[in-house]
Regions:
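Histidine-centered metal-chelating micro-motifs
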Residues: 78-80, 99, 115, 119-125
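Aromatic/pi-system hotspot detector in well-structured domains
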Residues: 66-69, 114
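A short, N-terminal "cap"/entry segment at the start of jelly-roll beta-barrel domains
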Residues: 3-7, 11-65
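Short acidic-glycine-tyrosine-enriched beta hairpin
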Residues: 105-119
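Glycine- and acidic-residue-biased ligand/ion/polar-headgroup-sensing regions
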Residues: 86-88, 92-98
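Ligand-binding loop in jelly-roll beta-barrel domains
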Residues: 119-144
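Conserved short histidine dyad/triad with adjacent acidic residue
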Residues: 69-84
């Protein structure tokens, strides 16, 4: 089946609508306003012995994606299997210790430490114990 220019002219508005729909889907995150997030009011998501709290997921005033979550990682547990993604992450360890995997090596960090994870860097966090580890992760940039 061959398409004429006339056929294509009928398809153009549909393609434009579909493309704008994709742009709208990408921009559904809200622009974040100044706000205090009370720890006790954040919903808790449980995954086995681990817990996480989503704090916010939105856009800065310039449209830059930013997301913050908190995790309580039980002794001997890992955050997730090693993986990589486009966005960058900053992990700030509040309590405990974590073995941070990145760049093909593992580095043990203690409370008060920060780990920066570059785009497309395979990573994960493991709690060597004996106490729970609590940390914040700030994800910067688009996830895809």
């Amino acid at each position: 089946m061959s398409l004429t220019r006339r056929d294509l002219s009928f398809l153009l508005p549909a393609l434009a609508t579909a493309a704008s729909g994709q742009e709208t889907a990408k921009k559904e995150k809200p622009v974040l306003a100044a706000k205090a997030y009370e720890y006790s009011e954040l919903p808790v998501k449980t995954n086995g012995e681990n817990q996480s709290r989503a704090v916010f997921d939105g856009l800065t005033h310039t449209g830059y994606p930013v997301e913050l979550h908190m995790t309580r990682l039980a002794p001997g547990q890992r955050s997730h299997p090693p993986h990589k993604h486009v966005n960058e992450e900053v992990m700030m360890l509040l309590r405990g210790q974590v073995d941070a995997l990145y760049g093909g090596k593992t580095t043990r960090v203690t409370a008060g430490s920060t780990v920066y994870m570059a785009s497309m860097e395979e990573h994960n966090w493991t709690n060597p114990g004996p106490e729970p580890a609590e940390y914040f992760v700030i994800a910067l940039g688009p996830k895809t």
